[in-house]
Amino acid sequence: MAEWGIGVGTLGAMSSFRVDLRSDTVTKPSEAMRRAMAEAEVGDDWYDDDPTVNLLQERCAEAVGKEAGAFVPTGTMANQIGLRLHFSGPGHLVAAAAGLHVTSVEVMTAAALAGIAYRTVDAGPRGWIDAEQAAQLLEPDEFYDVEVIDLISVEDTVGGVGGRVMPLEELRAVRKVANDAGVPVHLDGARIFNAAAASGVDAAEIAAEVDTLMFCLSKGLGAPIGSVLCGPADMAREARRLKILYGGAWRQAGIVAAAGLIALEEGPKRLHEDHERARHLAEGVAEALPGSVDLEQVETNMVLVDTEALGMPMLEAIERLASLGVGVTHSGGKIRMVTHFDVDDTGIGVALDAWRRLAAEVVKKGETA
């Protein structure tokens, strides 16, 4: 019988992994989360009467200094509702850096569901659009230019370049350009709490520079599912309408919202541990394979590895690591590893042992060639 699904080969062979570094989305609920889920007070989110969902939305909005929040199943849905909120209909243009989640994974979603197109810029290894680039995009090329930018979208941390943090002063500069042009700013803050932990800047201070933002409960914070879109109270009704329109109105969603409350409360406190382990992992891989890791790029919980030094194709290296019990994936032509709630020091040791074995095999192959 045929099945609907996506075949990802070794990227999906989780049962064989001793340590799973593919993403911070692979975490299992903690015991506290499981208890909270079992005991959650629930209602029907479609009718807006699930008390646990409503409490989660309120606390998430408070955490980032916004007035209202909408709990939805995925980060993609949160972003798409957030973008759509700013437009009355289709036919709008959004400025953003190339390679962001919204301009890659979600690019066709925006086109199909909201009639939104993107004007992208090459942000290079930093990953974010800067104020000068934003100003250039907002300036019409000619008098009758129909390609008018209606919104600027940013991401923090920037996953495509290894979880780099957009400096607050850079975000403020982009916000000023947007304000001067009268256009809003939306933040894909899937890992905003990682950005806050790494920079020492409160998440609410980052969020103050944007009109709307979303963040994931199911990435670094460790919840099993869910993201929250946050913004001003006067957008809350329309956000709820779009949530229903996009199929995001849950039923007894308090069951998963209960885990989200624990993730929101406890998750940010321990993100620095993920960052420290990512640094240790990066330094170890760089030692085993000199030149394979740009340590200056390792700011949060991601490590990108250039496999050129291995002398084997990237996908072959991923399969070899999987055979050694280490789950990894790839991004931008490099192997990507992400530390998270379920990766401890022992797991980092397992990963480093695998990389050292890989490096030793390359040396041995070179000696016998």
Where are these regions (language model features)?
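Conserved PLP-enzyme active-site core in the AAT-like
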Residues: 4-296, 300-324, 328-343, 351-369
